[in-house]
């Protein structure tokens, strides 16, 4: 490649990097807000369908992501380290503070050039998470940097059975490592083949087969391509609404 070609490639890469606000050390520029003081468990589940993030293993440090980050639910359960850009906003940012949040919700767009509109990178955080990096009294928005990090979870991966009749759906939560799930397959004890599940919404996956009265095994692949198989994690006596754990087997 001649020097002109090398220069062109360099310029293209530089423009691509600047377009998403990426820094040379891996941090990406974004903005953050918080969605109020009502952080009861029932108010934090959101578009990922976790219902109660505390029961799902995520605690109070959660966030709704803009569409650019949420990716139609693919980021549900993923972890992000967020720090306030103190040099850009020393009045409201806490110097050197960072917090790790779990993606549990979607921050919707609006017709008023909102912060969550595409292609913006934005975190609408729970107030406990937000005030780990910003001063209290701030009711506006702060500039931040973020990066994707591994999730540290206690206990095993959790499988919550949902649906009714022969409509089977499972909500997968408390996932360590990469945190966010790319694909799921299920196998009942009466069958020999894995059935590929489809994302119904958020962290909820559905299958087309009737799996009632069977022990269930799941093959879970994360967005970082790591896969684990959880054999017979759900007993044949399962019913809708019950949650089962992989008993310590976890992604790292």
UniProtKB/Swiss-Prot annotation:
Record's subcellular location: Secreted, Cell wall; Membrane
Residue span, Expansin-like EG45 domain: 45-156
Residue ranges of domain Expansin-like CBD in the record: 166-246
InterPro entries: Expan_Lol_pI (IPR007118), Expansin (IPR002963), Expansin/allergen_DPBB_dom (IPR007112), Expansin_CBD (IPR007117), Expansin_CBD_sf (IPR036749), RlpA-like_DPBB (IPR009009), RlpA-like_sf (IPR036908)
Membrane-related topology note: Peripheral membrane protein
One example of a Gene Ontology biological process annotation: plant-type cell wall loosening
Keywords: Cell wall, Cell wall biogenesis/degradation, Membrane, Secreted, Signal
Signal peptide start and end residues: 1-23
Keyword check for Signal: yes
CDD domains given in the database record: DPBB_EXPA_N
Pfam families named among the record's database cross-references: DPBB_1 (PF03330), Expansin_C (PF01357)
Any one GO cellular component localisation term in the record: membrane
Physiological role: Causes loosening and extension of plant cell walls by disrupting non-covalent bonding between cellulose microfibrils and matrix glucans. No enzymatic activity has been found.
Family according to the record: Belongs to the expansin family. Expansin A subfamily.
Protein name as catalogued: Expansin-A12
Organism (species): Arabidopsis thaliana
């Amino acid at each position: 490649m001649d020097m002109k070609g090398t220069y062109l490639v360099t310029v293209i890469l530089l423009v691509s990097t600047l377009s998403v606000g990426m820094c040379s050390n891996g941090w990406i520029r974004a903005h953050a807000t918080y969605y109020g003081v009502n952080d009861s468990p029932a108010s934090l589940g959101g578009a990922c369908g976790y219902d109660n993030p505390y029961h799902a293993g995520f605690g109070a440090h959660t966030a709704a992501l803009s569409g650019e980050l949420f990716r139609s639910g693919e980021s549900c359960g993923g972890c992000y380290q967020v720090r306030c850009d103190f040099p850009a906003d020393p009045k409201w940012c806490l110097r050197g503070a960072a917090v790790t949040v779990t993606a549990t919700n979607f921050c919707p767009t609006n017709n008023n050039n909102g912060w969550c509109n595409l292609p913006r990178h934005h975190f609408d955080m729970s107030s406990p998470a937000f005030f780990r990096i910003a001063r209290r009294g701030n009711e506006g928005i702060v500039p931040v940097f973020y990066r994707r990090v591994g999730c540290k979870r206690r206990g095993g991966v959790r499988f919550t059975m949902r649906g009714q009749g022969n409509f089977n759906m499972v909500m997968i939560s408390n996932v360590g490592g990469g945190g966010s799930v790319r694909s799921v397959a299920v196998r009942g004890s009466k069958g020999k083949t894995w059935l590929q599940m489809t994302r119904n919404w958020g962290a909820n996956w559905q299958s087309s087969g009737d799996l009632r009265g069977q022990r269930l095994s799941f093959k879970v692949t994360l967005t970082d391509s790591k896969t684990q198989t959880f054999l017979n994690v759900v007993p044949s006596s399962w019913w809708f609404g019950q949650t089962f754990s992989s008993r310590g087997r976890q992604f790292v």
